[in-house]
Amino acid sequence: MHNKFYRGRFAVAPMLDWTTRHCRYFHRQFSQQALLYTEMITAPAILHAKYDLLEYDPAEQPVALQLGGSDPTQLANCAKLVQARGYTEINLNVGCPSDRVQNGMFGACLMANADLVADCIKAMQDVVDIPVTIKHRIGIDTLDSYAFLCDFIDKIQPYSQDFIVHARKAWLSGLSPKENREIPPLDYERVYQLKRDFPQLNISINGGIKTIDEIKQHLTKVDGVMVGREAYQNPALLGEIDQQLFDQNQPLITARIAVENMLPYIEQQLSKGVYLNHIVRHMLGAFQNCKGARQWRRHLSENACKQGAGIEVVEQALRFVTE
C-alpha cells in the first residue's frame, strides 16, 4: 500500500545503549509504520571496527542510522557503506551534549559551526540517494536566539530537507546528558515557528512527548514527531501508532501479542550465542500499568542473566501478567 504520509511522521528516537538491533526488532512488533533509529554510531567506529556495527534484521525496516562525526570525508565514506547495507535514511547527530561526544567534535557542539555541518551533510548527500537528515537542539549555551536557530537552518537547508528538532537548548558544560534532557525548558512553539517560517522543509519535533493525543496535536503544527524515552519505557504506546496515525485498518497490537511474536526471534538469537538478557532488557517496560508488571520485570531481571537462560524465562514471566 502506498504510504500517503511523510516517512518521518512518527519515529522512535536514537538512544545510546537503548535502541540496539534487539530493541528495534521488539518495537517493530508493535508498529509496521514507525521509523526506527539505531543508536548513534561514530564514523571512525564504522570505518575501523573489527566487527559489523551495521548489522540489522530486514524485519526492522524502515530503519535509519544515526551517525556521529564532523569530518566530511569520513562521513561520506560511512554514508556509502550505510546505503549499501539498505538503511532507509542517514541522520547526523547535532544534538547530543555529552562531554565524550564534544571531545570527538560531534553532537550539539556542532551547532556553533553551521558551515561545517552543512559541509558534512553535503558530503554525504553527494554520494548517496537516500535522505540525509539532521537532529539538533533549538540552541546551545548562550547561542539560543530564534535568529541563531534560523541562521543554522538556513545554511543547511540547501543540502537537507529534513530537520528533527529537540525542543530544548543544550548546555555544553555543567549539565549531564540526562539533565540536558530534563532541565532546559521545552519550547514547542519555537519549533512550530520554524515550520511556519520554513514551510518547504520537513520539520519533526522531539522532546517530552508521551501520549497519542500529544503526538496528534503536534502533527497539526509540524510534519513529524519523534518519541524517545516514553517509547522505550512504555513500548505498548507503539501498538496504537499504525491505527491512530497512519489510518491502518488493523487491531491494536497489545504487549502480549508483541512479546509472543518475539519468541521465534529470541530462539534464533539464542542459537547464535546471543545472551537472553541482551534482548529482554529492552522488554521490561512492555506491560507498564498492567496487573503483574512488577513480577514480569522482576522475573526477567533475576533470571535472564543466568547462565543458560532460555525462552522459558520469558514464557514464565508472561504468566504473571494480565492486560
UniProtKB/Swiss-Prot annotation:
Interacts with tRNA, annotated site positions: N93, K178, R181, R294, R297
Gene Ontology molecular-function annotations: flavin adenine dinucleotide binding; FMN binding; tRNA binding; tRNA-dihydrouridine20 synthase activity; tRNA-dihydrouridine20a synthase activity
Pfam families (alphabetical): Dus (PF01207)
Coiled coil start-end: none
CDD domains noted in UniProt: DUS_like_FMN (cd02801)
Entry binding sites for FMN: P14, M15, L16, Q66, K135, H166, N206, G207, G208, G228, R229
Keywords: Flavoprotein, FMN, NADP, Oxidoreductase, RNA-binding, tRNA processing, tRNA-binding
Reaction(s) catalysed by this chain's protein: 5,6-dihydrouridine(20) in tRNA + NADP(+) = uridine(20) in tRNA + NADPH + H(+); 5,6-dihydrouridine(20) in tRNA + NAD(+) = uridine(20) in tRNA + NADH + H(+); 5,6-dihydrouridine(20a) in tRNA + NADP(+) = uridine(20a) in tRNA + NADPH + H(+); 5,6-dihydrouridine(20a) in tRNA + NAD(+) = uridine(20a) in tRNA + NADH + H(+)
EC number(s) recorded for this UniProt protein: 1.3.1.-, 1.3.1.91
Family, per entry: Belongs to the Dus family. DusA subfamily.
Function text: Catalyzes the synthesis of 5,6-dihydrouridine (D), a modified base found in the D-loop of most tRNAs, via the reduction of the C5-C6 double bond in target uridines. Specifically modifies U20 and U20a in tRNAs.
Name by which UniProt lists this protein: tRNA-dihydrouridine(20/20a) synthase
